[in-house]
Amino acid sequence: MEEKKQQNVTIKGTKDGITLHLDDCCSFSELLMELDEKLSTHYYDGDGRSLIEVHVKVGNRYLTEVQQEEIRTLIRNKKNLVVDSIESDVITKAEAIAWKEETEIVPISKIVRSGQVLHVKGNLLLIGDVNPGGTVIAGGNIFVVGSLRGIAHAGYYGDSDAVIAASVMNPMQLRISDVAMRAPEEKEDGAEAAECAYINENNHIVVDRLQLLTHLRPNLTKLERGIV
């Protein structure tokens, strides 16, 4: 009995076009050869005019930019096919380090005084105060276990879903991504409580009760609960 040949390329039609599942164990040259053969055998012409989007999934195979371009070129040379995305389940060490820096929580215990700037790439957990004239900046969220009376800029690299939270919120200025908010009205003595700031659906920064974060940003870690 003839042994069935391992399929390195699987083609599935979807409502958005076609999806190519490429084996991650065979050699890249074998993969290209079978991909070319299968795309030549299957004729995708749609209505003869519109382009058909192709989504490529390569599993646990890392592709260099050159290899990605080889796949794009091969598919592009077939009638009416255009690559919409190439997805891999693996990343380079450099990409992993960058991702870790952008998503990790950086705990720092200090007082940020006037004229000082504290800047982290990921999420900032500051145990201490930000005095008037002091600035804290984070690529992600900012949590201040203390008084925020200076300037805070969360989502520094463009993350509009970032939030700012503080035990005492009396800032000079709040910024989230590219949206800024001037100092809110000073609270009366004894009225201070833990609060959070976020960008609402109207693209304005809103300051509200910290407890609302659970509903506003359900994907946040449980860290903010420890600030209450």
Swiss-Prot record:
Q: Which InterPro entries match?
A: CAP/MinC_C, MinC, MinC_C_sf, MinC_N_1, Septum_form_inhib_MinC_C
NCBIfam families documented for this protein: minC
The organism's superkingdom is given as Bacteria
Family assignment from sequence similarity = Belongs to the MinC family.
The biological process GO terms on file are: cell morphogenesis; division septum assembly; regulation of cell septum assembly
Q: What does this protein do?
A: Cell division inhibitor that blocks the formation of polar Z ring septums. Rapidly oscillates between the poles of the cell to destabilize FtsZ filaments that have formed before they mature into polar Z rings. Prevents FtsZ polymerization.
Q: What is known about its subunit structure?
A: Interacts with MinD and FtsZ.
Which keywords annotate this record?
Cell cycle, Cell division, Septation
Tell me which HAMAP family the record gives: MinC
Q: What is this protein called?
A: Probable septum site-determining protein MinC
Q: Output the Pfam families linked to this UniProt entry.
A: MinC_C, MinC_N_1
